[in-house]
Each structure stands twice: as structure tokens, then as C-alpha cells.
């Protein structure tokens, strides 16, 4: 994680906006009815959200706009990297699972890391929406929001794409793998 101040320098701010704009223009199919100027205005008005997008970026998420909520006026960003973000892999599901491990503990958990970044784990529906925009996680997998009933029994959900199909799986929440991370969403 970067600095706990949760504010970007003027240079970081400028560079991130430039990068996000470039990605936005390059991937118009993800947001065909959205104009960059409107997104940029929201970002400029919400520096804490820009900080969270920077955290998504530096951990390998390649965030991009995927939707506009007309009711709230918010723009929705998802991690759009082809594979689960590299800086967020080899982690278990949540803090409880991390504490449960007696040895070989991972460095962090998906739930804690996403909270620290100011983002939310994707839900199953959001993950499926993301997969409508391209082929993601064909070599990796990503933890997603898990129902309390499954979590209470020690499990957690993750998803990936194999054989041109999106799959939902379960695993022990304390498990972690080099090819499993998490994807996040952020509303601005």
C-alpha cells in the first residue's frame, strides 16, 4: 500500500487522470454512452476516490469505467486487468481466515486489503457483468463477496473464466494461491 495520507500529490493526480483517460478512450466498448469529461469532473470533485483508483492501479488492477448509475449519478469502476491484479494475489479471503492459519500465513486478506484501498470486492453479479466486457481471469481466479451462511461454515467464493465459460467455485477462506487475488469496484 502507498502512504496512509490517502491523498495524491499534484503530479500523481495529473498522471493518474492522464492514464485513466487514455484507458477510457482505448476501451470505449466498456462505456459507449459515457463521456470522459463527466467522469473527470466527478474524479476532480472526489480526491479520496482518486486515491482509491491509484491504489487499484499500483496493485495491477487497471481500473476503468464500466457503468453509470443514472439514479445516483455515480460512475462505476472495476478492475479491468486481463488477469487478477498481481499486487493482490496470494491472499486469503478475510481477517478471520488469516488469523485461523497457524503457519504459512499470507501477507493479507482480500476483505482487509479492499477496505484499506477504499474499494469493494466484486459480487457474483458484478463479476459476471465484467465478463460481458471481455475475457478476464483465464489463467487466474478472483475472490468475490461471499454469503454470510457460506462464510460462517469456513468457506468463501471465487470465480474465473475457463473454456469460454464463467465459473463460480468455493474454497476454504483460509486458502491462498499465487494465481488467486481479487477484483474491486469503486463508485465515484
How should these model regions be labeled?
Residues 2-120, 124-188:
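A binding-site-centric feature that preferentially detects glycan-recognition modules on secreted/surface proteins
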